Each structure stands twice: as structure tokens, then as C-alpha cells.
């Protein structure tokens, strides 16, 4: 049975992920931390970290393995939350120490401990993140990681090729461009309560619910996908609205207000109907739903309503919308109910895959290459062996 984790509201916020997102609400089954990466997933169950899916870069934390369809136990300290990137995984212990494992090609593990070659730089067991920092939340992008310290200061590490670390100081040379191999402070005097990261951008919420983003697709009136920003820039909220939660996808970001209204901006999954398919400012998600949380990854987004039903929107290339039809030209521009009738307490987004913690205390996944599952699926598939 899936059981509990929740050291605080803000700590539980980090559990979702990509990849992973620190602003989702804590699950109804406290204690189950869940994160989805590129083609792998991890969960904390009763203080034990278990991972499954692709492990070719050490992201399962048990060495290098092509794939493990059955969850395996990671030799990690007791963790209370998880996030995951394309090929790396990170978690926090109860004291706020951060540990990461998997690919370190671009410094996304943030460690000074010895690493291996898989054959590229990686860590097949958890490594302590450098800097003697204590974090309340983490968020993972594709090849970078960010965290908020106990006082709300933002730090990031990993790839910085388009400003996703929020600093001009990350100028080390990594596989895919400039980077920082250890945590560096984001160039801002603001403090934050939540953070979310994607491929080339990162966003955070301050205590008032205002969104600040850096990197790519910032949600301002400028064409930010042409001119990336290397410092946080406030996202323009229509009508002065503030968000209670925010989640970054591949080229878009979505947020939900305290009243349950969802807004998105960027390219692809903005959920505004047939048009527009992109917006440089936040636009309301159509369909008339009141969401308690939203989750974005890749080209899609999903939201949960009060009864735990999941609705998704965007392209359905691999079944990530959770319904038929599936295909490279199929897209759902309005929130569409995920099939199967499951009710979820929380979701974890990752690339073209979604997993969720159900109200029946199971984990189910749908979309591309279901971690530990049969392949692509447009219907949620329960993960066995948890």
C-alpha cells in the first residue's frame, strides 16, 4: 500500500515533475513522492526510494541498465520528495539535503563528489549536492535543476545554454553548452515559495503568487523565444491575478489561481481552444473547468478537478492526453477527460508521459513508453510491484 510523506506543505509541493515541478499540492495519500523523467520514474514509499524504466545513464540509481520494468530499490538516504529530469533524479531528505543521481553531462547533479562514466559523466548512486545548502523544494528541468533554500532564495545548476539558471555567472563548459556544475544563486533579490523547471526555462512564485520566469517563454509581451532573458522577469498577470500553483512544460507554462482558474502561455498546450496555439501572455484555459492543480510537460498539460478527475490538452502523439485517437497529427485544444475513470490525488508529468497517485493508493501512468509498462498507452496503466 502506498503510504505517507509530507514534511510540510511546501516540501510536498516538489513532488511532481519535467519534468518535475515543485508547485503541485500534497497528495491525499501523504507520503508517496512521485517523479517522472524522460523514460523513467521514481517513487518514495515508506521512506524507500524505488525507480523503474530506462536506466542507461544511471537514473534508476542502481548502476547502468537498459531498462527495469519492475521497480528497484535505490540505495538512497530516506527521502521525502523527488524530482526528475530527462535522465537524472534528485530528492530531498527531511533536513533539506539534496541528493541527485543519473546523467551529469551538463552538471545537473550539482555535486563535487566523484562521478563515473556511463560512458558519459553520470552517477549511478545518489550524490550529495554541493554548497552546504538546505532546500525546502526542488524542481528539475530537462538538463538542469533548481531549488529554494529555507529562506526562499533560488539556486540552480546544470545547463545554462539559454538562461534557464537565471544567471550570467554559469559559464563552465559542458557537453551541451555553458553550465554550472554546482548550485549558483539566481540573479534576483526576491524570495520565492515555489519553483518549476522545463527544458529551457524556469519559473517561480513569490509569496504573493506573482510569477517570475527566466530563460525561454516568459509570459511577457516580448517574443521571449527569440530573446532569452538571463535574469528573472515578472510574468504579466491579466487583471492582476496571482497564482497558487504553476507548472512549466517544454515551451509553455500553466498556472492556477486560488479560484481554480487555469491560465497558460507559450507555444502548444495553452488550452485556449482551436486558436490561438501560442501566446506571449497568459490566456485562460477554456472548457469551464475549475482546477485544483495543473501539470505541464513536453507539449501537453493536464489538470485535476475537485473530484480527482484528470483532464489533459495538447498533442496526442503517444497517448499523453489519456484518450483516443492517437497520432502525430492529433491534438486536443480543450481539456479532455483522461479515460479509465480513475481519480487522482496528484499527477507527475515527464516529457510525453504522465503518472498519477490514485485515490485508491496505486500509481498509474499513460503516454509514451510507460515506465515499467507495455509501451505507449492512451489509458492509464497501473504500475505493478509497488
Where are these regions (language model features)?
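Bacterial N-terminal signal peptides that target proteins for export
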Residues: 1-10
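Bacterial Sec-dependent N-terminal signal peptides
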Residues: 14-32
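Beta-rich catalytic cores
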Residues: 30, 37-38, 67, 78, ...
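Conserved core positions of repeat-based scaffolds
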Residues: 36, 40-43, 51, 88-91, ...
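Residue-level detector of Asp-centered blade-edge/turn motifs that repeat once per structural unit
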Residues: 36-38, 45-46, 84-86, 94, ...
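Acidic surface patches and DE-rich sequence motifs
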Residues: 44-45, 55, 93, 149, ...
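Short glycine/serine- and acidic-residue-enriched loop/turn motifs that recur at repeat junctions
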Residues: 53-70, 101-125, 158-182, 212-237, ...
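Surface loop/turn motifs at the tips and blade-to-blade linkers of beta-strand repeat domains
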Residues: 73-76, 129-131, 186-188, 237-239, ...
Amino acid at each position: 500500500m502506498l503510504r505517507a510523506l509530507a514534511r510540510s506543505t511546501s516540501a510536498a509541493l516538489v513532488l511532481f515533475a519535467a519534468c518535475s515541478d515543485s508547485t503541485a499540492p500534497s497528495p491525499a495519500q501523504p507520503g508517496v513522492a512521485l517523479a517522472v523523467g524522460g523514460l523513467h520514474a521514481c517513487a518514495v514509499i515508506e521512506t524507500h526510494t524505488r525507480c523503474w524504466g530506462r536506466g542507461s545513464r544511471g537514473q534508476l540509481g542502481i548502476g547502468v541498465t537498459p531498462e527495469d520494468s519492475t521497480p528497484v530499490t535505490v540505495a538512497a538516504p530516506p527521502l521525502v520528495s523527488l524530482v526528475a529530469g530527462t535522465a537524472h533524479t534528485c530528492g530531498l531528505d527531511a533536513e533539506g539535503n539534496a541528493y541527485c543521481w543519473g546523467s551529469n553531462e551538463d552538471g545537473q547533479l550539482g555535486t563535487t563528489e566523484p562521478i563515473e562514466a556511463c560512458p558519459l559523466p553520470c552517477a549511478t548512486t545518489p550524490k550529495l549536492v554541493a554548497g552546504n545548502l538546505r532546500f525546502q523544494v526542488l524542481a528539475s528541468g530537462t538538463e538542469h535543476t533548481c531549488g529554494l533554500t529555507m529562506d526562499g532564495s533560488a539556486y540552480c545548476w546544470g545547463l545554462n545554454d539559454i538562461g534557464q539558471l537565471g544567471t550570467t555567472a554559469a559559464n563552465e563548459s559542458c557537453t551541451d553548452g555553458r553550465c554550472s556544475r554546482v548550485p549558483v544563486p539566481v540573479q534576483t533579490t526576491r524570495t520565492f515559495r515555489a519553483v518549476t523547471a522545463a527544458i529551457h526555462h524556469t519559473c517561480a512564485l513569490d509569496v504573493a503568487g506573482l510569477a517570475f520566469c527566466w530563460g525561454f517563454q516568459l509570459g511577457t509581451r516580448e517574443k521571449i523565444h527569440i530573446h532569452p532573458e538571463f535574469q528573472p522577469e515578472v510574468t504579466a498577470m491579466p487583471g492582476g491575478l496571482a497564482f497558487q500553483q504553476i507548472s512549466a512544460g517544454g515551451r509553455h507554462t500553466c498556472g492556477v489561481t486560488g479560484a481554480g482558474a487555469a491560465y497558460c502561455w507559450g507555444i502548444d498546450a495553452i488550452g485556449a481552444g482551436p486558436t490561438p496555439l501560442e501566446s506571449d501572455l497568459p490566456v485562460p484555459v477554456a472548457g469551464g473547468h475549475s482546477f485544483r492543480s495543473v501539470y505541464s510537460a513536453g507539449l501537453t498539460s493536464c489538470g485535476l478537478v475537485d473530484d480527482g478527475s484528470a483532464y489533459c490538452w495538447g498533442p496526442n502523439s503517444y497517448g499523453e492526453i489519456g484518450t483516443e485517437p492517437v497520432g502525430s497529427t492529433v491534438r486536443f485544444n480543450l481539456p479532455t477527460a483522461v479515460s479509465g475513470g480513475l481519480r487522482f490525488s496528484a499527477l507527475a508529468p515527464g516529457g510525453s508521459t504522465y503518472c498519477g497517485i490514485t485515490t485508491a493508493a496505486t500509481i498509474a501512468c499513460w503516454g509514451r513508453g510507460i515506465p515499467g509498462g507495455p509501451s505507449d498507452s492512451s489509458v492509464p496503466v497501473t504500475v505493478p510491484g509497488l
